[in-house]
Amino acid sequence: TFKSKNGAYVREHFFGRYPETAALVADMTDDEIWALRRGGHDSEKLYAAFHKAQTAGKPVVILAHMVKGYKIPEAESKNTAHQSKKMSLESLKSFRDHFQLDIKDEDIPNYPYITFPEGSEEYNYLHGRRKALNGYLPKRLPKFTTEFKVPSLEEFAPLLEEQARPISTTMAFVRFLNTLLKDKDIGKQIVPIVADEARTFGMEGLFRQIGIYNPHGQNYVPSDRDLVAYYREAKDGQVLQEGINELGAASSWLAAANSYSVNNLPMIPFFIYYSMFGFQRVGDLMWAAGDQLARGFMIGGTSGRTTLNGEGLQHEDGHSHIQSLVIPNCVSYDPAYVYEVAVILQDGINRMYGEKQEDVFYYITTLNETYEQPAMPKGAEEGIRKGIYKFETVEAKGDKGHVQLLGSGAIFRHVREAAQILANEYGVSSDVYSVPSFTEVAREGADAVRWNMLHPTEKARVPYIAQVMNDAPAVAATDYMKLFAEQVRAFIPAQSYHVLGTDGFGRSDSRENLREHFEVDARYVVVAALHELAKQGKFDAKVVADAIAKFGLKTEILNPLYA
């Protein structure tokens, strides 16, 4: 306000508030008061502040008071500075004169770029400062030049086989991580980052194996010192245990994820956290990660609206994949099985750190639900990477109809269960597809459609999902909002497509009850499939109604979106 007025106004309303301050300018004219500079525009004061900061021995914050729109006559210290799209000719001349810039009147309308002649005092000063700082910043390598050996998928062979006992996909990630950490070539370049207690994810074994990083070492005796996997901190520790500090953990991840470019030292950061507390809390940093061409893995553990049960609205994530898909170079997956996790992680390392060095980063959701883990079907590897593959075909006697069933993550097992019910009780056969990434499938499909539009005289490209699927009615079910699976609707060849999802707030209840509440369990998949077949005339509507009654589905309750 003061700088938008004049010296007399400043005398009355600033200095004149108290007799002591009024006396300070009693012998000054209004023009002299008006000429007083704010600290941020006073080179002597700035120099003094920086000089004092040099000797502080600790971080120093310099608060510099400045004027908005400085030396722009019509905008100086006015809120209209935010609305100014360009400076008038007179403002430019005034700006030039004040800062003593060597620009002729006739050149001002062209906004000439100001350079300093080589050898001039200004030129030598600027380059001298850069030399003193060991180079010019920002300086980024588009690709690192150091040697980096990408592990082959065969090195994770145990994860591709049927597991001896039920385990979760989060445990599959931990086993993959353990194998990486033991790799003699790149083990030291792995950066595990945890934003909460690592024991939540079964990672306590890393405490003894590689330790928790603490620059001061361990200065206390942890309460679990008598355990094998006690809370071991060390100066050479490798795990970054950030506590409940997602912003700090994401910042550590960003630093490691950009090390390939800034330091020519590729690091592979794995930031694992409750999936609800990732993009929802640090979404701006993840957008920055895309902007900065970061490389690494975000692991959304304990994911799924109905899978992290009993935690209610705060923890039950059914939309992180919606948030991740808005970042163009974030590659997202929601794997259902251990072998899918292994294929996706190895492929991610190869894409980001292999020969091509793609500028992408990965978001992978993993589960805390344990269940039987089959071996990888023959020929599934390519489909896992691309986002969809046929897991199985379930034949039925009677041939009363055929459907296609799609699913991902925790709900895929319910999709498989539905296929068996359809075959055994309704004579309906099905093709069952695992869709580790609806997002990648949709992106590839959109890319094909765009290419076809721009190349009308050439042979049209067929979206990958259209190559994999057929034209039978399709039903998709996931542990995420319907929008997640809806992404692929435009690209599937199916005659109809019905999507089930978990739109709405979470609940504190059992997984069984939550999946009933959100209408994504096997019974709802069956009813949705019968409904699609009935629309085609394959079944009478009464068959669908009888199935609803048989399964005890509640038809008059509020839509879970609003419940």
Question: Which ranges hold each PLM region?
Answer:
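Thiamine diphosphate
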Residues: T1-P374, ...
